[in-house]
Amino acid sequence: MASGPHPTSTAAAAAAAAASASSAAPSAGGSSSGTTTTTTTTTGGILIGDRLYSEVSLTIDHSLIPEERLSPTPSMQDGLDLPSETDLRILGCELIQAAGILLRLPQVAMATGQVLFHRFFYSKSFVKHSFEIVAMACINLASKIEEAPRRIRDVINVFHHLRQLRGKRTPSPLILDQNYINTKNQVIKAERRVLKELGFCVHVKHPHKIIVMYLQVLECERNQTLVQTAWNYMNDSLRTNVFVRFQPETIACACIYLAARALQIPLPTRPHWFLLFGTTEEEIQEICIETLRLYTRKKPNYELLEKEVEKRKVALQEAKLKAKGLNLDGTPALSTLGGFSPASKPSSPREVKAEEKSPVSINVKTVKKEPEDRQQASKSPYNGVRKDSKRSRTSRSASRSRSRTRSRSRSHSPRRHYNNRRSRSGTYSSRSRSRSRSHSESPRRHHNHGSPHLKAKHTREDLKSSNRHGHKRKKSRSRSQSKTRDHSDVTKKHRHERGHHRDRRERSRSFERSHKGKHHGGSRSGHGRHRR
């Protein structure tokens, strides 16, 4: 629709615009938006801004679909073939006609509903929109346009009754449940959608009155059979798309032409009578062929059409999900990057070859072989460095266990202010126990290295050096390190070697008593420091 600024300043300006537009003649014709505008500019027009306007005329008599929108239609773009779409159009128009009769609507309202139905599905697809819901919306909207409104409840009840008759079931009233409420909301939304898609241009110019007027010009209005037959052809042509392709005057001439040929009533041919009404013979023949083709088609099968539409709908949904990278259930699909998708491989072997080994069994074997490799590495003569490191680790753990046993013996003693002899005897006993434990913790292969006298000497020196450090440091180191490393192993070994350790304990106690006098001063000084 073309429009321009409308002068509203003064009445004189409006009069000048009307005077300047007297030489302009509006053009008749249709456009895709349903409006026709004619604008003529003269030298005596009205200047508004930088433009000169003479007249703006708006007509909404009729709207036609342009040729480029007739094929392919939105339904054909969604995968629906042309015969199925034609059957759906015919079935929808038949539903509107039958519902209009049951609703006692005038024929003009039923014709308006069918034209709106055709217009809507030239902009939308049958796959995405239910034709039955759209048919309800179109007849409800047409009843309002033709000033014969009906309630939505009545429209839904009539379509429910027609559905039962089509399925050859016993008619039963519609239950007012949630399904009814959902259907009602769908009809209301579909009506709004029709208005939006048509740009609120829902005016339809019907050829009913034009047929009567043309027959009066031809002096055939008294022939009721001719009038009724032409009227019937016009109602049948509403199921085709001729009402969105041709002007109503051309359709009226084609209906009169068909009725006269069927009843063998002669009409003027020199010149042809339809030239008087501005119609060509090619257009009349095209409308007649399209209308007569309607009678050669089989009755559309509702169930097959529903299955076809549902099939196309599922295919469309699959294509959309595939474009988004999703499966049918909404879960994300596996990516084909890296060749991990089974679809990328032409064929996968069903049986695993004997030469190929499972990675799980290889991992298990490597785990089992690890301790054997460690034992072989410790026994080999080339790993002397590892043996020395192991010895140093065992000596460190022995010293830490000594400090731990000593701290435990002190913490467990109930009295700290005993005389020096009792404290010394307690420390010596704890030392002997720690020595025996440390010797039992060390591996058996290290027992032949050194005499017990040298080991006792080393342990006393380690004890003196450990006494010089802080008491808090001993506790933290002994608790954090000795517990985690070898406490579990020590408890297991003590359970199996109790008899052997008892003999060693007696030997260490006798050795202790013999050397008691030599180290009497050092131990006293150490205990004195701790008491301070």
UniProtKB/Swiss-Prot annotation:
Q: Which SUPFAM superfamilies match?
A: Cyclin-like
**Is Ubl conjugation one of the keywords UniProt gives this record?**
yes
The entry lists its GO molecular-function terms as: cyclin-dependent protein serine/threonine kinase regulator activity
Which residues does the annotated region (Cyclin-like 2) include?
Answer: 209-293
> Where does this protein have compositionally biased stretches of type Basic residues?
388-424, 444-458, 466-482, 492-504, 515-532
Q: Name one GO biological process term.
A: regulation of apoptotic process
Sorted alphabetically, the Gene Ontology cellular component annotations on this record are:
cyclin-dependent protein kinase holoenzyme complex; cytoplasm; nuclear speck; nucleus; transcription elongation factor complex
Which segments carry the region annotation RS?
396-438
Residue(s) of cross-link: Glycyl lysine isopeptide (Lys-Gly) (interchain with G-Cter in SUMO2): K345, K353, K368
InterPro entries (UniProt xref): Cyclin-like_dom (IPR013763), Cyclin-like_sf (IPR036915), Cyclin/Ssn8 (IPR043198), Cyclin_C-dom (IPR004367), Cyclin_N (IPR006671)
Q: How would you summarize where this protein is expressed among tissues?
A: Widely expressed (at protein level).
Question: Phosphoserine-modified residues are where?
Answer: S341, S344, S358, S361, S380, S451
Subunit structure comment from the entry: Interacts with POLR2A via its hyperphosphorylated C-terminal domain (CTD). Interacts with CDK11A, CDK11B, CDK12 and CDK13. May form a ternary complex with CDK11B and casein kinase II (CKII). Interacts with pre-mRNA-splicing factors, including at least SRSF1, SRSF2 and SRSF7/SLU7.
Q: Which family does it belong to?
A: Belongs to the cyclin family. Cyclin L subfamily.
What job does this protein perform? Involved in pre-mRNA splicing. Functions in association with cyclin-dependent kinases (CDKs). May play a role in the regulation of RNA polymerase II (pol II). Inhibited by the CDK-specific inhibitor CDKN1A/p21.
Protein name, per record: Cyclin-L1
Name of the encoding gene: Ccnl1
